[in-house]
A protein has these predicted regions:
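Ankyrin-repeat-protein effector appendages
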Residues: 1-16, 162, 172-173, 182-185, ...
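Conserved ankyrin/ankyrin-like repeat signature
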Residues: 28, 60-61, 93-94, 126-127, ...
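Ankyrin repeat domain, specifically the short helix-to-loop turn at the C-terminus of the second helix
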Residues: 30-38, 63-71, 96-104, 129-138, ...
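Eukaryotic tandem repeat interaction scaffolds
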Residues: 90-146
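Intrinsically disordered, low-complexity regulatory segments in ankyrin-centric signaling systems
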Residues: 1-35, 44-47, 67, 117, ...
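Ankyrin repeat A-helix N-terminal signature
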Residues: 19-24, 52-58, 85-91, 118-124, ...
Length: 206
């Protein structure tokens, strides 16, 4: 696979920077950078090495790339970048390294959502906690389907302990429980319809 950029690699040649970062091989990443590889090189999908390293969960590789000047904001063809990938993976072990790159937390994924929304959807309790405590991510951002993180946690969650805790944290962070979806259905109404009694109780308490 080749993007035509230096160090991109090909099926017949050595792996490029992005592929190497996706393997979490910090030592070889360092060698490639020392050899002149572009730290913001992209693969055929537009993905950068630092984004690949976040998906790989390799904190040393992310640290190395950020220290070398990699942009954590560059988005690939699916609109993913290093910061947005955190919401998908929930891997808090790489959060510190991504934050060192001063990410734009307002950038959105292919669904128009911030990193907080998929983290809430997927039940990534510790990632939601960290994003709320350590970034200025908008707790009430509405994505393209018309859902906030609170709505997403209720609608796409399973009503279990993880999603209940996420709802609690979002409310404590000031999430607006009255923001409804495009059909005018509130988080409380969704929780009640789904039989998520613990979540409904949180949403009725003030």
């Amino acid at each position: 696979m080749s993007t035509g950029s230096a160090g991109a690699g090909s099926g017949d040649g050595p792996p490029g920077l992005v592929e190497t970062a996706a393997r979490g091989d910090a030592r070889l990443v360092a060698d490639l950078l020392d050899g002149g590889a572009d730290v913001d090189e992209r693969d055929d999908s537009g993905r950068t090495a630092v984004t690949a390293a976040v998906y790989a969960g390799s904190a040393p590789t992310v640290r190395l790339l950020v220290d070398a000047g990699a942009s954590v904001d560059l988005q690939d063809d699916s609109h993913a970048n290093a910061f947005l990938a955190l919401g998908e993976t929930g891997n808090v072990s790489v959060l510190d390294e991504v934050l060192r790159g001063d990410p734009d937390v307002g950038l959105t994924n292919r669904f128009g959502g911030t990193a907080l929304i998929p983290a809430a959807h997927r039940g990534h309790v510790e990632m939601v906690r960290a994003l709320l405590a350590r970034t200025e991510v908008d707790v009430d951002h509405v994505n393209d389907p018309g859902w906030t993180a609170l709505l997403e946690a209720v609608i796409l969650g399973d009503g279990g302990p993880a999603h209940t805790e996420i709802v609690r944290m979002l409310l404590e962070a000031g999430a607006d429980r009255d923001i409804a979806d495009r059909d005018g259905v509130t988080p409380l109404e969704h929780a009640s319809r789904s039989g998520y009694d613990d979540i409904a109780a949180l949403l009725t308490s003030r």
